[in-house]
Every structure is written in structure tokens, then in C-alpha cells.
Amino acid sequence: DLFTRIKQSHFSVPKFNDWIFIIFIISVYYIFWLLSKRKYILVTFWTIIILTLLITFPTNSHHKITMLNVGQGDSILYEGGKNQNVLIDTGGKVINDTKQPSYSISKYHILPTLNERGINELEYLILTHPHNDHIGELEYIISHIKIEHIVIYNKGYSSNTLMLLSKLSHKYNIKLMDVRQVSSFKLGDSSFLFFDSFIPNSRDKNEYSIITMITYQNKKVLLMGDASKNNESLLLKKYNLPEIDILKVGHHGSKTSSSKEFIEMIKPKISLISSGKNNMYHLPNIEVVKRLQRIRSRIYNSQQNGQVTIDLDDNLKVDSNSYGNASRSEEHTSELQSLCKISYA
């Protein structure tokens, strides 16, 4: 309806550098001076110019991968230049019988980054698997930013969760796609490949994780979701995997993932581990860290490094900060979260 369309209309202004900001302030001051002189035609002219510059202000066209700081969860942003953006997972608090989500992770950790970078639309949202720490913020995200496509692996979801996803997609005019119908897609000069490495009839939803490889020029990025060693073994059997520039380490650095054979085959130059400070699971596992260190991979862990951005157009330059470490509390338990309870091995 009209209200929904209006609610989904977003306007994000990218963060300006200091010189642009100074010019903007001077221009606003000049407009007020013109108003005081009653030069209304010039006021209109300058107002149109400033608004046009704000709307068309060129954002950084570099291709970047960002591990968003969502605590004990996963959310990865890929910026493909020219406003071609993909989000992989939304983060979300772990839910069990004794612990409930206390605040909206996306409100304080994800949306501020998108707004700062002038991102008001996502071409794709890839949901790796139906665990709350990966998709728990879906409802909040899709109600605050326009999304064209959502990619899931249907077999990993219960009928109730699929029904809810279908309902939400219809409400926000998003195309819901099964990964088996897509297999790959191109976004500008970046290509996305989904590996067929699911473990049939597994009782572990982690083994239904969508594994994605992004290729840009000669750079390779591998995003593992919470895939297990079984998925890795299947990958090694079915595919001739290249060496990887950036690896999003599987399952937050748990010992259930990142086997010796797998890590030694792909030899990631940079390894990203998304895990919460002082998490009850003691992740990342020390053996996984040592395994990565032995191949001299540069390790970035959100516990110490916060949000991490890697510029694919600038020799894999890394920028890390603790952006989004909000301590505010806000009750935020969605229907989707209650359907996606998880436990860690």
C-alpha cells in the first residue's frame, strides 16, 4: 500500500570529507545572506545547486568488503561500486530458553554504516542459513532499507519460517529466490558464485549454509557462513578451489569448521572472524587461529578489531575500528527470531 511504499523511501547522504563540508557550510551561509538582501531568485538558484550536489554527490566507487561489528553473529557488506551493494546475513542475538535479544543490532551496528556510506538500497540480501545470529535482524533491515532480492536455500528452513519469509518479501516487494535457481550472478564487474556443497538430510542447519565466492578482477573472496568441515570436504572433492585473498572464516572460528586440509588448500591472505567479546563459546577456537597463523594469514577478529573494511581496489588495504559498539538497550524480539533458535557445538 501507499504507506508501506512511503516508509520504504529512504534518502541517505554519504559522509563528506572536510573540504566538501566547509564548502557546504559557506554555501548555506551565503544563501542566508542572500535572503537578508531579498535576492530570492539567487536564493532559489543556489538552493537547487546545493540540493543537486547533495543528491548526485559521488560516493567512493571502490569495491570493498566489510565485516560489520555485530557481536556473536555474522553480517558482511559487499560494495561493488555504483551503488551495487550486497549484504550477506543480518546478524542477530542468540536466543535460547534463558537469553533473549536485548536490543536491535542492525539499528546501532548496520544501518549507521549503510547511511554513512550513502547506501539506501541493496541489490541482494543473501541469508546463509536459518540461525538467529545470521538472520535475526531481517525484519528490521527490510523495513528500513530497500532490497531487490533475497537469496536463501529453501531446504534449510522450516515451513513456518518459509511462510514468514514469503509474507515479508511480499509485503516489501522483494523477490525471494532459492539459491538453486540462481547458482551465480554478476553485479557490475563483480561475480558471485554459490557452491553446491550442502549436506543432504543433515540435522545440523549449519551444514545448509550458502557458501559464496566473490570474484572481482583477480581478487577472490570466500564467505563460509557457518559451514562445517563436512561442507569443506565436499567443496574440496567437487571443486578446484583457488587460493583466496579474503576468507570469512566459517562458524565464527569454531572447531567445527576450518579443517587443516581446507585452510592449507585455499591459503587465505586475510581471514575475518566475526565473534562477540567474552562470548560464552570461547570463540574463536585457539587451534583454528593457530592453523591460520601457520599459513601466515592476516587475522582480523571483530572482538579486537571491531568493524573491518578491506578495499579491493587499494591493494587490500584494511581499515578497522570499533564502530557500532552501542550499549543501549531496546527490547527487540521478532517472530522470525523466535523461529530460529540455535545452539553452538
Annotate the PLM regions:
Residues D1-T66, I270, R291-N301, Q307-N321:
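Transmembrane helix-bundle segments that form internal channels/tunnels in multi-pass membrane proteins
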Residues H62-P112, E121, K205-S228:
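Conserved beta-strand hairpin/beta-sheet module of binuclear metal-dependent hydrolase folds
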Residues N69, Y78, D89, L114, ...:
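Divalent metal-coordination and catalytic microenvironments
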Residues N85-D89, E123-L127, H149-I152, D178, ...:
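Structural recognition of the beta-strand scaffold that forms the well-ordered cores
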Residues S106-T113, L127-S143, D196-P284:
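Active-site-proximal loop/helix segments of hydrolase catalytic cores
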Residues N132-K171, L176, P268:
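Active-site HxH/HxHxD metal-binding segment of metal-dependent hydrolases
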Residues G156-L193, R203-N206, K277-S329, S334:
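Binuclear metal-ion centers of metallo-dependent hydrolases, dominated by the metallo-beta-lactamase
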Residues E330-A345:
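Single conserved hydrophobic/aromatic residue that forms the stacking wall/gate
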